[in-house]
Amino acid sequence: MKKRLLPCLTLALLLALALAGRAAARTVVTTTTNLPTIQISVPSTANVYINPNRLPVQLTASTETAQIISSPCYIENLSEVPVRVHVEATGSARGGISLVGETTAGSTSKAKRVFMYFEIQAGVDPDDVTWDNEYDADSHIVIRDGDTKTKNSMVILGSAEHEKRYGVFRLTGDCIEEPTEAWNSRDSVTVRIVFTFTPLPVDTEIP
């Protein structure tokens, strides 16, 4: 009987040795998200002129005669990636001004109505920008009194090393030239503009 048990014992030992030769180990992989640092130069203030009689107004590099004129302003992308620019604008009228949602050109109103809108263009040279000829609801933001308007994806700016890294913006529009109550120095509009930026892939095509 002892001899018959030997093969079974030998097989059991071989299995035990084979199992003992197996080992397990694990690797823990930690993922880190590499996010770009967004750095944009944004002016803190700007000047807007209400110019009902279309008098010549001397700006930095030109003389303007429009009814709504703003000093030249621009943001500059100093980031390592392109950015998409979203804009939020809120108006606040003083004096007898009423901020309206459509042009006053051809209007017979005698109220102090002002039609003002925000425009931004991506450019190579902040001193040389081609502006739109007229208001476009799809591209511009109308300024309303106490009402915040938001428009997403207004422009895409190239990275700091790209020539088209400037977002040049202005406030423009028109107003009633001769209201019943004459224009005076107390009539003014303050506009609060907030920019928000979304980083884009480095190979994004810049329009």
Role assignments for model-derived ranges:
Residues M1-T30, C73:
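Gram-positive cell-envelope targeting signals
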Residues K2-K3, V129, E181:
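Short, low-complexity intrinsically disordered segments
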Residues M1-K2, A20, A111, V142, ...:
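Intrinsically disordered, low-complexity sequence elements enriched in Ser/Thr/Gly/Pro
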Residues R113-M116, G167, I193-F195:
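Short non-domain terminal segments
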Residues E64-Q67, E134-R192, P201-I206:
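Exposed beta-sheet edge/beta-hairpin loop segments within beta-rich domains
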Residues G21-V81, G95, E177-P207:
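Short, polar/proline-rich extracytoplasmic segments that appear immediately after membrane translocation
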Residues R26-T30, L55-V142:
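Surface-exposed interaction patch
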Residues M1-L15, N51, L55, A137-S139, ...:
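Terminal low-complexity, poorly structured segments
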